[in-house]
Structure formats: structure tokens, C-alpha cells
UniProtKB/Swiss-Prot annotation:
Organism per entry: Methanosarcina barkeri (strain Fusaro / DSM 804)
Name of the top EC class for this enzyme: transferase
Gene: trm1
Name of the protein this chain belongs to: tRNA (guanine(26)-N(2))-dimethyltransferase
Family statement: Belongs to the class I-like SAM-binding methyltransferase superfamily. Trm1 family.
SUPFAM superfamilies referenced in this protein's UniProt entry, alphabetically: S-adenosyl-L-methionine-dependent methyltransferases
Amino acid sequence: MIYKTIVEGTTKVSVPVPPPDATFPPSAAPVFYNPEMELNRDINVAATAAFVERLLAKKELLREEVRYVDAFSASGIRGLRIAGEVGIHATMNDWSPEAFELIKENSKINGLEENTLATRKSANVLLHEQKYHIVDIDPFGTPAPFLDAASASVRGMLSVTATDTAPLCGAHLKAGIRKYASVPLNTEYHSEMGLRVLLGACARELAKHEKGMLPLLSHVTRHYVRTYLEVLPGTKQTDRTLKSMGFSIHCPKCGFRGPVYGLAVHIEKECPVCGSFTQIAGPLWLGPFREQAFCDEVISELEMHPLNTKDKAKKIITFCRDELDIPMFYDQHVICKELGASATGIEILIEALKAHGFEASRTHFSGTSFRTDAPITEIKEIIRALSW
């Protein structure tokens, strides 16, 4: 295997380069490095740094006492960046013997042997054995089989990536039900559906360990969902968290959507707007998927670090911060297609909604999506008026 040196942030690592005549996809290599996830890792550095500052502000821990684990490390790039750029101890785990050796080599390259630990174990075994302040689950595919062990291990922040967006978003319905014990719907807001299904799964797994959660930052970018959750121990926090769980109603005929809070609820099957039969998604997370103050802290950390994707990262976090806390978003183009109307600039539509007395904002999910508390009938009337 040929290796090359790459640089992310201030961290250098040696990563394998599959031969040009390889008959397997890059993800099937003995050690997988994905350059497309640099943005994810840049945001991870800033978000982890922001959370560590919160931990240190409580004056219960020293920086050298904070423990972070990357349960699926491959080359070690994610954990090494946390150790070197955030300055806390990082455990990097991978079951692959090739990855285990490469992690140790890359630790030496960065002079981080004293601040890191390489382990070669099943992720679930390691997480059931050890407690960590920050647990990072970034597997290839679904994180579902590892959420229980991660919930048992975590003491401060749980960071989770999911790349199985088809099951999460409803494109592969049965797989989504099997993995997440939730019914997703493949709607125009399927990306938000996937995020809320994942958050709901995390909330339910944490609840089994009498832990609640506060979503600090969540985003859907390219082919993956990523979330950072502050973990709050105790039954009161757990019960408070579960109050943000529920179901989402969707009318495929008129576009109505609305939340129903609670895990044991009666849901009317008829759409309150047009009387058609509705579809039901859930259980899923209906609460905010980010904390505005934390977003500001992450943006500040992004400014302080030399990052290749800084501008893209800041744009994503800013959009997340400024979104309304109203599930689920609307897509202007979908509504315009239904009405046979011409689309205007998204900012023009948002200002028109506000002028009519409604709340409205853009979202980070797409350039044509928006949130509002306006009823679907009012949204359509405003779009019709703007298209003339």
C-alpha cells in the first residue's frame, strides 16, 4: 500500500492511497481516509473546543483530565486533531490491525504519544469498559448498533455521525424502522426528517441510562447527519428530554405538516386542512436541534483555528443558529410546482411572510427551504401573490 502525508488544521497524518488499478472502493481499503469529511472534522474541532471550554469553566476538571474517545479512528485523523488542536487526551480506537499500527505511527509524527492512546477493540466493548467525557461515534454507515454503549460511556458530550441517510430519511423505509425503531417519511423535508429520527434514537438510548440530552449543534451536510449532544444525568433531565419526543403528521395532498408531542398519543388520521388521510412519522425529536449560544461559541472557535474549510463551516453554523425552532421546513420550489407559480428569491418570500405577521427564516438544509409558523393555506396565498 502506498502512503501519502496530508494536513488538516495543524495535524499531519500518513494515509493510504489505494492503487489506481484497485478493484475495491476506497471505503473497503484496510484503512479508510475520506477527504470529503474534512469539513466535518473542522467543525468537530471547533465544537469540541467550545464544549471543553464549558467544562473547564465549571472548575471541576483540568484540561489534562478531560477524556475524549474516537471509537472508529481508521488513520486517527479525528482523534489526533482533538489531541493536538484542542489539547485534551484522546483515545483512538479501531478493530483493524492496520489502522491500529497507523494510529500509533501518526501519533509519533505529531509528537502526541503522551496525549493519546491507541486501542484495538470492538467499539461496544471499549465503550462499556471505559467512561469518557466526550464520546465521538463516526462509523461508516449507521451508528445505531453503538448508541447504547456510547450512552453508557459518555459523561459530557455525545457526538454522532450517520451516513446511512437513505434509511434515516425514509428512502429505505423498512431499514429505517429496523435500525432506528422509528417510521421516517420520504418527503421534501427528508433531510430534516433524518436528523430528527437520529436525535430521537439518541434520546431514547440515553434515557435507558437515565440521561437526558440538550442538542448543542446538529447539521445535515452532503451525505451525512452530524449532531453534538450535551448529556445531562438524572431522571429529571431524562423526563424533561422525553417531553421533546413525539410524532410528525404530513398530508401528501395539501402539504400540511405538524408536530404531536408525546410517545403515547392519539393522532387523528384526517388532515385538519383538506380532510385527506395523513401520514405519520416517528417517534422522533421535535425540540430544537441546536443551542444558539453554543453556535456562537463554535463560530468563535472556528475563527481561532487555521482550517481549510473555515468559511463553509461558519456558513453552516450561522444558518443553523438563525433557524426558527419550528419543525418541519417547507420547500418553496415544491409549493410553486403544485401551484404552477413562479419562484421568487427565498429572502423575498421570507420578508413577505414576516410582513403578514408570521415568523419565518431560512434553513441550512437547502437554498430553497424555509421555516415559518404560517399555515399552509397562508403560505400558498403569499406565494401566489408574489408570482404575479
